[in-house]
Structure formats: C-alpha cells, structure tokens
Amino acid sequence: MSTRRKLTRAEKKAIEGAISRAKKTDKKQKSAQDSIPYIRMTVDGICQVTQTHFTKMIQFRDINYQLSDNEDKQSIFDGWCDFLNYFDSSVKFQLSFINLTASEETFAQTISIPPQEDGFNSIRDEYTRMLQNQLSKGNNGIVKTKYLTFGIDADNIRVAKTRLERIETDIINNFKRLGVAAEVLNGHDRLKVLHDILRMDSLEPFNFSWDWLPRTGLSTKDFIAPSSFLFNRAKDFRMGKKFCSVSFLQILAPELSDRVLKDFLDIESNIVVNLHVQSVDQVSAIKTIKRTITDLDKSKIEEQKKAVRAGYDMDIIPSDLATYGAEAKKLLADLQSRNQRMFLVTFLILNTADTKRQLDNNIFQTNSIAQKYNCNITTLDYQQEEGMVSSLPLGLNQIEIQRGLTSSGVAIFVPFTTQELFQGHEGALYYGINALSNNLIMVDRKKLKNPNGLILGTPGSGKSFSAKREISNAFLVTDDDIFICDPEAEYQTLVERFNGQTIKLSPTGKGNDGKPCYLNPLDLNLDYSDEDNPLSLKSDFILSLCELIVGSKDGLAPVEKTVIDRCVRLIYQDYLNDPKPENMPILEDLYNALRKQEEKEAQFVATALEIYVSGSLNVFNHRTNEDINSRIVCYDIKELGKQLKKIGMLIVQDQVWNRVTINRAAHKSTRYYIDEFHLLLKEEQTASYSIEIWKRFRKWGGIPTGITQNVKALLSSREVENIFENSDFIYMLNQAAGDRKILAQHLGISPHQLSYVTHSNEGEGLLFYGDTIVPFVDQFPKNTELYRLMTTKPDEQKEVK
C-alpha cells in the first residue's frame, strides 16, 4: 500500500493559490485561464493547442556571433539559412526570445558568499559587495532565454507524437551543426516558461507537480495563470499588476542589418520578442511569383500602349512598376537557383512595465530601435488579447499580419549574439565582466571535462593578480586545498592573511623564521599511484630529478635510466616493508645505492648527485620537517637561485601530488598554482613527468594552473602541446606579437578575437572555458583590502606592509 508524501508549506500555498485563481466570481465572466489557449499539456512536453494542432519546444543557447570575424559571421549566417530551409510548409515554428528580470533576492543569493566560522567573513562580505557592484554594471539582473516552438497538424496526439519526435531529433542535430547547444523541454519545463511570462509580477517561484492534478481537480493552467487579465483598452492591457502592450514590426527597409534583433534584446527591461514563421510550399510560391510577374508585364504593356497613344516614349513607364518587376524577377531567381525558400513572418514584441508611464517609455525605446533600421513599431489596436496569446511560446499565431521573406530575409534576424558565462551555483568563481555584454563572468572549473588551466600573458598584463584573485575566491567559497609554487616571493602576504603556511626553501635550509626548513624529494605516499606499485610513478619523478641534476643536453642515457630505476626500487624496500617515517629514504640513500653499482653510468650519476648530498647544494638531502596542514600553502623558492630553482619546482610539484593522493580519499579537491610554469618544460624528462602529472591531476581531484609569459616553451614540442590539449580553461591576457601568432594557430583564434589580447590593458583578454570563448575585463576595485593583498605593484604593496 503506497503512502502519499506530505505536502510542504510552499506546495500547499501553491495549490491554494491555484484554487483561488480557478474560482469564477461570475459564470458569464471569462477567467484568466480562458485567455491561455491550449487544451492540454503532457508530461513529455507535447502541447495540444487546438483539436488538430500539436507543438513541442526546444531551448537553445547562444554562440559568439558578434565576436566572430566577417568570414565566420557569413558561415554562421549561411548555416542559419540552411537551418531555416529545413522547415517545410507542414511545420509551423516560432522563435521566442524572453528577457525577464530576476528578483534581486535571487541574484543576491547567486553571488553572495555564505559566512563561515573561520574568521574571514569580513573579506567574504567585501568580495560580495565587489560582485554586487560589478553586477550593477551589466544587465545580469535580466535572465535571457531563447526557444524554438514547432508544431504540426495531426488527427490525434498518438499520430502527432511520432512525427514531432522525428522533427525534434532533426532540429537538435541541425543546432549541433551550428555549434549550438539545445535541449528539449518537458511539460514541467514548458509550464515554468509560461508561468514566468504570465506571472512576472509575482516573486513566488513556480511550484507544480503532476501528482497534484487528480488530487485537486485543477488543470495545469491554474498553476500558471496570472491573477487577472484586463483587455479594456485599444493599445495595452493589464496582466496581474503589470502594464503590457503587444506591437508588431513593420519591415519597410529593402535591406536590414543583422543587428536588429540584438538591439531589441539589449533593452534592459522585461521584453518578449516572437517571430512566427510559416514556410510556403515551394511550388506554390514559384507559381505565385510567376503569376505576379505576368500581371506586372501586362501592366507594363498597357502603360506602353498608353504612351504610344499619348505620343511620348514607350520606354517611360511608372518607376514603381519597373521596381516591382525587377524585384519579382530577382525573387524568382532566388527561389529557383539560390537555395532560398519563401516564408511568411509575423514579428511581435511584448513590452511590460510596472506603470503606464514606464510602459510608454519602453515602447518609445523599442520604436527608436526600429526606426534606426527604417522600420516601424505599430501597436495592435484592439487585438491586444490575440497579441498576448501569440506572444506565448505555444506555437499559435492569432495575428494575421505577415510579411513575405526569403530564407536569407528571415535569417537576418540572427538569434545569436554573444555567449555568456554565468553559472549560478555556489562553486562558481568570478573571472571579470564580459567585454561584449558587461555581464558577470562566474564559472566553476570543476564543471569542465578537464579543469586544468593556464594563465598566459606578458609581464604587467595581470597574470599574478588574476591567479591571486582566483585563489582568494576559491579559498572563500570552497573547501579546496590550495598550493602555490612561488618563484618570485609574490604570494606570501596573501597566504598569511588567510592563515596559510609559507614554506621558504633556500640553499641554507633556513625558513622564514630562521629555523631549518626541509622537503624530502623522496617522500612517498602509498596511494601515490593508481597502480598496485606506487614506485612506478615515483621512479618517473626521480628520473626527472636526476635529469635536472645531471644536466645533459640530450637527457639521461638508457643505461643511466636503468641503474637509477634499479636503485630506486632498492632504497624503498625498508619503507615498503615497514612504512614508518624513519624508513623513508633520502637522496643520500640513492647516492650510496648508485655507488654500489658496477656500471660506470651509475658512478657518473652518483658523482653528479654528490653536490646535492654532501656538497653546498645539499638542502634537499634531509627528511621533511614541515608539518603541512594548512588549507593554503605557498612554497617560496625565490632564494634557491638558478642552480636549484628548477629542482625546487619539480620537488614542490611532487609534494603537491602527495597531497592530491591523500585528498582524493577524502573526496576533496586540490588546487595547484605553478608560476613560471615554462621552467618545468625545458628538459625532456622533466617535461614528460610534468605532462604525466598534468594528465593525472583531473582523475585525482586536482586542479592545476600553469602561469607563464613564455608561450613558446608551452608549444616547444608535440609532447608539451599536450598541456594545451589537457587544459579546458585558459585565461589569456595581453600577448606579444610572436605569441599571438602561435596561439591563434594552435587555438583557432580569429583575428577579431585576437584584438582582445593585442595591446590590451591590464586585466583584459580572452577566457577559454571548454568550447566557449568570451572577452573579459577585470577592473578590481582598488579601495579594498583584497586588492591591496593581491597587487604586485611595489608602490601599492607598501601600503599593505
């Protein structure tokens, strides 16, 4: 026997509200539900609009049209024409562009950082205020969505379902060819879209379950209908508390710009734009145009006869007649030989506002945009209810004002502008403002297939600042552990503010406090590798270390690799048998094991190792004496000098890998920032090990970020190019001319996109997030504690100290 789940207070409130809207005060009076013209909505998203017309709905995302160069724009435009040509006369479709203001509370929750009991809430509050300030610069308060609703006529829903699903598959595939992400909406999703339009005066979220219908006797309309409709005026109407007006676009210009639709959708108020499109049967269209040409030719002959009778030149005919004749012949040629179809289009705009004056201002603004392109906006006098119905994404057009356009004429209303990167969930971090739309860029690298990242830029472009901003944001928002390899001692101030550890490595072995500070490069965590034997990956690391130590131009010889690998397995035997700290080997154990080998190559490597064991560079010949337990740890290797810096970076990388393996068991992410990353990629074996670690990080919950100004080093070999291929996140700041050329070729950056990293200001560039490319600007407010902690400018750093 099944037990029914108890309704929550919010669910009860939603049902009570629906019941109150369902009650009629007068049997003769229409209810708000009566103005919503569909018969039923099914769970899988099929809407029966009339007895014989059925529709489905697809939401599609944006792509970077405005950011593309002319060649790419033409390619997108041609692809959109092909997309439109798919629809024959049996399939009506509707393009809906819905811009609705989200409640301030909703957006505040999205960007605010929840407090924690760790002593850093003052910085969280400051960061939240910064985000709110950046939010106000754009129109992130407006949620923009795009939909395609398509419908067919059928005898019943069973027949309609099969055909709609086939068309749906074709449309999704056609969107994929354009590089556009799209998904089909189910019944609940469609009802939510209708609810958001019809009840935009309400702050209550959409609350609905199919289970409630049989239990309450309500219909789906009762959960989406506004409190009332009032259609008692010629040019506007009331929908709940909102003042609304529907207008249509009169297309008067012979040619239109591809920016028309974009300009309408850039209006910073609630607006719903719809294009109802009906394909005309190709044979009928051609016949109609031929008939028109024949009629025009007859008129031309009549005019010529009149001219002869009147005694003037028969070639002088009315200019309109000549123009119409030329246009008709061009249209016929388009349909017959230029892959064009004929469409009938109705272009509707629904403006809404809180007051009548504000509504008039919105309509005036809309009309100004239309007039800029030699078009007119005309309100639907005494047809506001029909206009409202036609503005709902149901696939029903009750306005019989249509304009005939060819495929390219319809395609000029390009539905793509710029991609946005705004993920409204708690793990999303701030990366600046979209340079095209002024909207916040907030994303979570963990959502990428491969969260590994690169921060690239010339000196002074803001690389270190950008890294510090992400570090701070990640520390305040997530519980991730954060490690930094710091070759220039730039991160200590920030790390100390977050009560982190700075481990200073120097040739003398003295840390920040003057006490000995050692890291053992031979430290091994038994979970070091996926394999049963953790020594395999550790051996790769030690080979990389020895390659740096030997310093040969050609790397280690095969025999040298063999003897090192043999000795590695020998020196770890005691620890593997009894894994206690005192059994952990150090470099001296490796040195002694090499000395015992007979091969001359072993003696050669041992001799090279000697200075790091008993000579002046023996800082790494000790067991680790630092208890690394902070969430944020900085390895300051500035004082290691040229001889030890690369070795220090490699050892730090290995230490972080040990922490990654520990954190994986705790289901915790580990972020690792490597400044001057190119230094690890110059030697073949070291580069090979770094690339292997780079690949492994993702599987083990690691999020590495390489920071460098040297792009050429990143692309120095086919193997090193794997770093790019395994990095779905690239934060690209200003680039030198040579590097721009390399990056454009490798990442497929268009000349127009490249302009955003050409002589750009500090904190400006391109963000690559998966397949999305967005130009950004990050002007972090200087009057904040965080800015003073993150800046690398000496005069500004003095203020902190």
Residue ranges and their predicted role:
Residues 499-503, 719-732:
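A short helix-turn-beta junction within AAA+ P-loop NTPase domains corresponding to the substrate/partner-engaging
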Residues 463:
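Conserved lysine of the Walker
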Residues 466:
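Hydrophobic positions on the alpha1 helix immediately C-terminal to the Walker A/P-loop
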Residues 2-418:
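Extended, folded cores of ATP/NTP-driven motor/assembly subunits in large transport
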Residues 455:
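Hydrophobic anchor at the beta1->P-loop junction of P-loop NTPases
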Residues 473-483:
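Post-Walker A helix-loop "phosphate-sensing" segment adjacent to the P-loop in P-loop NTPases
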Residues 747-800:
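Conserved P-loop NTPase
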Residues 63, 70-89, 96-100, 263-265, ...:
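P-loop NTPase motor domains
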